[in-house]
Amino acid sequence: MPTPILDFDALAQTISGRTVLCIGDIMLDEFVYGEVSRISPEAPTPVIVAQRSEIHIGGAGNVARNVASLGARCIFVGLVGEDDAGKRLAAALADQAAIESVLVCDPSRPTTRKVRFVSEHFSTHMLRADWEQAQPASDEVEAKLIEAILPQIARADIVLLSDYAKGVLTARVIRHTIDAARKLGKPVIVDPKSLNWAIYRGATLLTPNRKEFAEATRSRADTPQSIVDASEDVMRLADCEAILVTQGEHGMTLVPRNGAAVHVPAVPVKVRDVSGAGDTVAAALAVSLAAGADWDTALRVANAAASVAVSKLGTAIVSTAELRRKILPHAYLAAEEKIVLEPAALDAQLAEWRTQGLRVGFTNGCFDILHPGHVKVLTAARGACDRLVVGLNSDASVRRLKGADRPVQDERARAEVLAALEAVDLVVIFEEDTPIDLITRIKPAALVKGGDYTREQVVGHEVVEAAGGVVVLVDILQGFSTTALVHRARGGAK
C-alpha cells in the first residue's frame, strides 16, 4: 500500500506554535578539520594538519538546536561549570532566538567539552579528546535543577529528557520531572542512557539506539522482531506508551504498548557523520508529537530528519526546509519549485537555459479555472519552444480585468495548478494589467496566445519580433470559457 502524502506544511505550521522543554547534559562540541599525510616521527601516530575548526552546542544542547531549527520554541535546562566553555555555551545559546536557556552553574565541575579531530578528505574521526566529570550532580545542585525545571513544565507542550549520563538527569531529577509532567498531562520523551529503565517510569516514549536497547534488555536486538519480542517486559517496567529503537542504516522500529509495531527502513543517503543524529531524531519526535501527530507520522518525520543529519559533517541541525524536501515527493517539490517569486531567480533561470542553447517561450493568462482550452494552448506553447514560462495575473490584476467576484482561486492556488503541468517550466506572477514588462524582461523566442487574438492584438509582439522572436497563435477549443464555467457553477444557464 503506497504511503500517503503527508500534509507537511500544515504540520510545520502547527509545530511553529509549540514549545518543547528540553532537559539534559549540554556540552561544547569542537571539530578540528584537517588533512593527514604522514606519521609522526615521535610516535606511530598520524599527524593531522589542522585547516579549520568549528564550535557547536552539543549533547542535549544540540537537541534544543534541532527543536528550534525544526520550527518550535525550546526552553532548555542544563548544567555548566564556572569556566570558559560554560561561558561560550551560554553565549551561544543566547544567540539562538528560539531557545530560552536556564543554565544551572556548578563551580565544582568542568563544563563537558569534546574535541574531535577529523580527516576532511576521508570524513573520518581520527581522535576525540574529552573534558568532563560524569558523576551525578550533588544534592545541592540537584535541588537547583529541580527548582529550575518545575516552573517550566506548564509552559511547554511536551517534555524531552536528553540523557548523556553526565550528571544532570539523576534519578531524583527524572522522578520530579516525569511526575510533574504527568500531573499536568504533558507527554515525556526520554532519550535514555541508564540501563535501569525503571528510573524513567511513567515516560511516554523511550528512544534508545540498538546498542542501548540490547544492553538494557539483555537481548541481541538484531532484527525488528527481536526488538518487538524484547520490548514487552521493559515497557511494563518503564510504564511507557512506546519504545522507538534507532538502528542506524537498518532504520527504526517503533513498538507501541497498544497496536502493531512499525519498522521503517533508513532513507538511503551518503553518510558523512553520525554525530548528533540521535539528537535530531529526539527533536523531530518531540516537535511532531507536540503538534498532535500520530505515531506513524512522528516516526516518518524522525526518520527523514535523521537521513538529513547524517549527510552533514559535525553536530548537525536540520531545518524545516530540508525536512520538507526529504519528506515530500519529488514531483510535488518539482512543481513547487517552478513558481518564481523573485526577479533575480527568474533572470538566473533564463540565463542558465540560454547558456544551454534552449529556446524560451512565453504565454500568459488568468487561468482561474483550468479547462481543456487552457491545456491545449499550454501544450502547443511548449511545443513551440524548449522551455515555457507562463505569466500569471495576480489576484489584484484579475479583479481589475474580470470584476470584483474574481478570481475564484487565489494566485498561489492558480500557480500551483499550472506548475503541476508537464508543459509548464516556470510560472511568474505579475501585478500589472498586461505582461509587457515581463515580456520585455524575458524577450522570449516564441510568444504564444490563443487564436482568438490577431498578431497585432498580442501584447508584446513588437518587443519579441524586434529581438528576433516569433508570435505563435494557437487554435482554441470552442465551448470552453472560465467565465462561462463560473456562471454555470453559480446557477446560471448553460
From Swiss-Prot:
Region named Ribokinase: 1-334
Gene Ontology biological process terms in this record: ADP-L-glycero-beta-D-manno-heptose biosynthetic process
EC number of this enzyme: 2.7.1.167, 2.7.7.70
Pfam families xrefs: CTP_transf_like, PfkB
Keywords in alphabetical order: ATP-binding, Carbohydrate metabolism, Kinase, Multifunctional enzyme, Nucleotide-binding, Nucleotidyltransferase, Transferase
Record's GO cellular component terms: cytosol
EC primary class: transferase
GO MF: ATP binding; heptose 7-phosphate kinase activity; heptose-1-phosphate adenylyltransferase activity; phosphotransferase activity, alcohol group as acceptor
InterPro entries, per the entry: Bifunc_HldE, Carboh/pur_kinase_PfkB_CS, Cyt_trans-like, PfkB_dom, RfaE_dom_I, RfaE_dom_II, Ribokinase-like, Rossmann-like_a/b/a_fold
Superkingdom of origin organism: Bacteria
Active site: 279
CDD domains on file: RfaE_like
Pathway: Nucleotide-sugar biosynthesis; ADP-L-glycero-beta-D-manno-heptose biosynthesis; ADP-L-glycero-beta-D-manno-heptose from D-glycero-beta-D-manno-heptose 7-phosphate: step 1/4; Nucleotide-sugar biosynthesis; ADP-L-glycero-beta-D-manno-heptose biosynthesis; ADP-L-glycero-beta-D-manno-heptose from D-glycero-beta-D-manno-heptose 7-phosphate: step 3/4
Reactions mediated catalytically: D-glycero-beta-D-manno-heptose 7-phosphate + ATP = D-glycero-beta-D-manno-heptose 1,7-bisphosphate + ADP + H(+); D-glycero-beta-D-manno-heptose 1-phosphate + ATP + H(+) = ADP-D-glycero-beta-D-manno-heptose + diphosphate
Subunit structure, as described in the record: Homodimer.
Family: In the N-terminal section; belongs to the carbohydrate kinase PfkB family. In the C-terminal section; belongs to the cytidylyltransferase family.
Function description: Catalyzes the ADP transfer from ATP to D-glycero-beta-D-manno-heptose 1-phosphate, yielding ADP-D-glycero-beta-D-manno-heptose.
Protein name: Bifunctional protein HldE
Species assigned in the record: Bradyrhizobium diazoefficiens (strain JCM 10833 / BCRC 13528 / IAM 13628 / NBRC 14792 / USDA 110)
